[in-house]
Amino acid sequence: MSRVKSGKVTHARHRKVIKAAKGYYAARSTNFRTATQAVDKANQYATRDRKARKRNFRALWIQRINAAVRLFDLEMTYSRFINGLAKAGIEVDRKVLADLAVHEPEAFNAIAARAKAALA
């Protein structure tokens, strides 16, 4: 029985890892073992931060909405505003509300007025 050699497969696998580590510092970009560790850690960070990005953007939207609501009415808070939206039957997500607050303040103020009226 002939001997099985895996030179091409191993070389391709190594080349794939080294290509993924391109731009890393020192041996992390050239040495297969350290490059493998660096790429694995980078993938862990990437996965973690994809999840964190969603939380960060939601927090940013809430901050922007809260600031715009307080500009509209000093007595109104973010939580009261969201409660007013629910009572008024306005189903707009936070991303759209934050975008309106930044780019279309008149439209946001109209929505805030309807939310305030629903609370009264």
From Swiss-Prot:
Pfam family, one: Ribosomal_L20
InterPro entries registered for this protein in UniProt: Ribosomal_bL20 (IPR005813), RIBOSOMAL_L20_CS (IPR049946), Ribosomal_protein_bL20_C (IPR035566)
One GO term (biological process): translation
Keyword RNA-binding: yes
Family: Belongs to the bacterial ribosomal protein bL20 family.
One GO cellular component term: ribosome
Protein name per Swiss-Prot or TrEMBL: Large ribosomal subunit protein bL20
Domain of life: Bacteria
GO molecular function: rRNA binding; structural constituent of ribosome
UniProt entry keywords in alphabetical sequence: Ribonucleoprotein, Ribosomal protein, RNA-binding, rRNA-binding
